[in-house]
Swiss-Prot record:
The keyword Ribonucleoprotein applies. GO terms for cellular component: cytosolic large ribosomal subunit. It comes from Proteus mirabilis (strain HI4320). Belongs to the universal ribosomal protein uL30 family. It holds the Pfam family Ribosomal_L30. The gene is rpmD. CDD domains: Ribosomal_L30. NCBIfam families: rpmD_bact. InterPro entries: Ribo_uL30_ferredoxin-like_sf, Ribosomal_uL30_bac-type, Ribosomal_uL30_CS, Ribosomal_uL30_ferredoxin-like. The lineage of its organism: Bacteria, Pseudomonadati, Pseudomonadota, Gammaproteobacteria, Enterobacterales. Keywords: Ribonucleoprotein, Ribosomal protein. This is Large ribosomal subunit protein uL30.
Amino acid sequence: MAKTIKITQTRSLIGRLPKHKATMAGLGLRRIGHTVEREDTPAVRGMINLVSYMVKVEE
């Protein structure tokens, strides 16, 4: 089984760049406090790096 990471949204999407909103949607995050589990891949890591100021990551 592939390694997974937990991603939690900690900040609002209001007033953010459209690209950042789309990245959050791509990660599956919808609201503050929402947590999703994603496979730990370079693509997902890149998405997290783009919106790192709005999310908390747990290994």
